[in-house]
A protein has these predicted regions:
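Single conserved hydrophobic/aromatic residue that forms the stacking wall/gate
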Residues: 1-11
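Active-site neighborhoods and metal-handling regions in enzymes and metal-associated proteins
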Residues: 12-324
């Protein structure tokens, strides 16, 4: 449009209009859910291919390219720039330059976007070489328990902020059992000590965008007059906090990351020493990171996975498909 035409419009954003759009797009109709299911079916093919290709000596970029090709072969495209890395401790790591090494884990956060623009978004973390080792099993099962806790309690009427906080308690208890955290779990989570390992939120809206409607402002999409965002480290990154409604499609994506620079910073600043066992944590600095993510539909009774088949997620399922 001609600049003079654009100048005739007010520069202010209408919060009432934004709220109306959010209300319309938040609850998905049956035809929208069908499109998301189809996108998730493509995501299944992408992630299972990545698992089969995850072998020592393979370059990350090769696997990432294969995932792009799978999406394209279904007449779709990736729904965002694929994250595929053996350095999962770096969040949103788009560097695919490494050669996969035995003893590391490959984190793949990838999805498909159909021509209708409806998206999928899944994450799996698998052991290079196809077999989980000692402490990998321990941390993986903690993250899986967090993931399953969210599925267990997510339902209409509950706030996703409260789901996030319950998941954080599962994480903290698991890390306490490993000797990495200590003290009262409820107090540790309230203080935000667990955020050393989980510096992001549990999930976000899904739909026409991977982070659906994020451009309208997360304060309108994930929050409302009742549930307000927090300023606490970690919890401040929760994109979706408000009460769930039937028809919402959201992500469930807990993680556990050992970020050397963050560990060193917190230790130097004596952060949460009542709850964190830094001597034990230091031994995990070379661990990397784990995230497990599914897209879920809020139903009248609770929630369900989107897509026809769930991407392998238990240790037994993952090892089986990696060693076919």
């Amino acid at each position: 449009p001609h600049p003079r035409f654009l100048h005739s419009f007010p520069t202010r954003r209408s919060s009432d209009l934004i709220k109306a759009v959010v209300a319309l797009r938040s609850v998905k109709e049956a035809c929208e859910i069908e499109e998301i299911d189809l996108a998730c079916n493509i995501g299944y093919e992408m992630h299972t291919a990545a698992m089969r290709l995850c072998k020592p000596g393979v370059k990350e970029q090769y696997i990432a390219g294969v995932l792009d090709g799978i999406a394209s072969s279904y007449g779709s495209m990736t729904s965002f720039a694929t994250i595929l890395t053996q350095h999962g401790e770096t969040l949103h790591n788009h560097d695919h330059s490494h050669i996969l090494e035995v003893g590391r884990m490959m984190l793949t956060d990838a999805g498909a976007e159909r021509l209708s623009n409806y998206c999928s978004d899944h994450t799996r973390t698998v052991p290079v070489g196809g077999k989980f080792q000692g402490r990998q099993k321990d941390v993986y099962n903690i993250v899986l328990a967090c993931h399953d806790k969210a599925l267990e309690i997510a339902r209409p009427g509950i706030t996703y902020m409260s789901v996030h906080q319950e998941v954080c308690k599962v994480l903290a208890q698991g890390l306490k059992d490993l000797g990495l955290m200590k003290g009262n779990i409820d107090e540790a989570v309230a203080a935000g000590a667990h955020a050393l390992f989980l510096p992001h939120g549990l999930g976000h809206m899904m739909g026409l965008d991977v982070h659906d409607m994020e451009d309208l402002g997360q304060i309108y999409v994930g929050y409302d007059d009742e549930v307000r965002p927090s300023s606490q480290f970690g919890l401040a990154s929760l994109r979706m906090g408000r009460r769930l409604q039937e028809g919402f499609v959201i992500t469930d994506e807990p993680g556990c990351y050992f970020i050397p620079a963050l560990i060193d910073k917190w230790r130097a600043e004596k952060m949460h020493t009542d709850f964190l066992n830094y001597d034990a944590i230091d031994k995990f600095k070379d661990f990397g990171g784990i995230r497990l993510e599914d897209d879920i539909l809020i139903t009248p009774e609770g929630s369900r996975f989107t897509g026809e088949k769930r991407i392998p997620i238990t240790i037994k399922e993952v090892e089986a498909i990696m060693n076919e």
